[in-house]
């Protein structure tokens, strides 16, 4: 990115009282101009602490939604309105309600990589780093873990005393990594 563009971005940030948050996954040039770079949890946390009235989010839609949920009075703008995480849409409200009807005492545990609509229907939202600790401390035996089945199965493997119900959500990038490829790479 040339200096002229960088200077223009800095000028606009001051004029618009804006801060730029960028996920690790975005291009290096975008990370260079960002005020903060990190994972979705870190950026959500930073979003609650920045004084600027406008947050420009360089990441996928659920990240921007999370920033808005945590900062309802701030303006949150997505750098790319089409950036999305397919896994975030792999469960719907009807499925949550169906599971609640079948298991009246279920706790709906939602991985943060989900839409605002799904978060609103859930009992608790977790990250990959705190999912095990939070689920372990839930009083409910029945756990509906959404949308990421792989993270849910890892948590379930550590908590045999709980009964897990899974959604078939997944990250298409992560599920394309197979044991055989890892063994071959060794």
Indicate residue ranges for each PLM-predicted region.
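Active-site loop-to-helix "anion-binding N-cap" substructures in soluble metabolic enzymes
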Residues: 1-186
């Amino acid at each position: 990115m040339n200096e002229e563009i960088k200077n223009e971005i800095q000028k606009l940030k001051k004029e618009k009282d804006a801060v730029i948050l960028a996920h690790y996954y975005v291009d290096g040039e975008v990370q260079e101009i960002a005020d903060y770079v990190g994972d979705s949890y870190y950026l959500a946390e930073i979003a609650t602490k920045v004084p600027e009235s406008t947050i420009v989010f360089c990441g996928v839609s659920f990240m921007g939604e999370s920033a808005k949920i945590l900062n309802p009075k701030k303006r949150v703008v997505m750098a790319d309105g089409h950036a999305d995480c397919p896994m975030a849409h792999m469960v719907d409200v009807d499925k949550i309600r169906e599971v609640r009807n079948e298991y009246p005492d279920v706790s709906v545990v939602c991985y943060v990589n989900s839409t605002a609509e799904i978060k609103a229907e859930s009992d608790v939202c977790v990250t990959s780093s705190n999912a095990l600790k939070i689920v372990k401390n839930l009083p409910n035996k029945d756990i509906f873990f959404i949308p990421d089945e792989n993270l849910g199965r890892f948590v379930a493997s550590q908590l045999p005393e709980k009964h897990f119900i899974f959604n078939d959500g997944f990250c298409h990038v992560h599920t394309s990594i197979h044991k055989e490829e890892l063994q071959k790479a060794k």
